[in-house]
């Protein structure tokens, strides 16, 4: 696979976390289908099964990129995303997959630099997603991500060009009838955004050197790239709120991923306190 692309990450069942995922997803499908049948949900049991599993998988995959050393966070995100899907109808996963690719672009979790077709494919996907969802700020986030990849360790300079393309399309969208900032954001939304920003800054500032390895080499992930990827994921979530308003909290599982990262961070901090050392 890596002979053709530097983007893909297969779910290798040799790893315990991947085996756990492959066991959990069918169970979630059955639960989603059962709940849809029990409560006579309009989309039906089959659609509910696939929707629930897709939301859970998307959240798991993104959180594995956001916090590669903490596999437990991914399963927290999986659980929250599935609950949000069943209880609140959080079925849209497009933004989650866009964020996943943007984060992977920056943190280089697969190892090698992107091939030209990888760049073109993700660039096109980001543009299409921004236009189809009418979220022009997504292009700003993508531009920052491409610029970071062209700047950080082992830079890929052609991504400056990809960033320029994103900015150009962003300006083109602004010239049309597109809303940049939603009108229904209230003080509480801004408080939550600020609180999440503070949490993400704390996570990045206190994170140790990564212990996870790249997929295709014996090299460990780069701390600056991992932290930059985390910030990119948060920016992707925030831009949806700014454009779509308060409804974006529950439209997509991306905030489940952010919450899972922060919960994982809080758990690590609590367990570092004197008297909280686990024995055995």
List each model region and its residues.
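Generic multipass alpha-helical transmembrane bundles of integral membrane proteins
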Residues: 105, 111-237
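N-terminal topogenic module of multi-pass integral membrane proteins
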Residues: 1-119, 227-280
